[in-house]
Amino acid sequence: PDTLPEDPCYVAVLTNIMEHPADVIDFSNQKVVTNAAREILLISRSPIPYPKGTRDFEYEKVTGIQLYSKQALAFYHATPKSILEKAEENDMMRFIENGHKVHAIVSPYKTVSVDTPKDLALVNTILKEKQHG
């Protein structure tokens, strides 16, 4: 967004559009579903939304880059982990389950999360290609 919303407990995450079908079923990728205002409705490691009625949508994943207002950090510190946060291992669920909006901002730049040895190998390959390419 161009300006920060009125909510003093402001949280936003950077996302990327997923380009490869295999990434959608990879549990290390946290997928998001948003409403028309780009507020996150759900974050899951499962493929969401499930393509039962249509495949006319893009899967979006969390990059790991997050923005918190001072009030959001205070809320996070003072509030225990939520049920879905524990299940999905995603701290954004703490805000969502407690009624705070989390905004998703799609980045035009592709990012790589480094959460597994496979991710690290991919980053090393990318860096080698940049050095020699």
Where are these regions (language model features)?
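Conserved alpha/beta core of the MobA/IspD/sugar-nucleotide pyrophosphorylase nucleotidyltransferase superfamily
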Residues: F57-G133
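Conserved core of the sugar-phosphate nucleotidyltransferase
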Residues: P1-P80
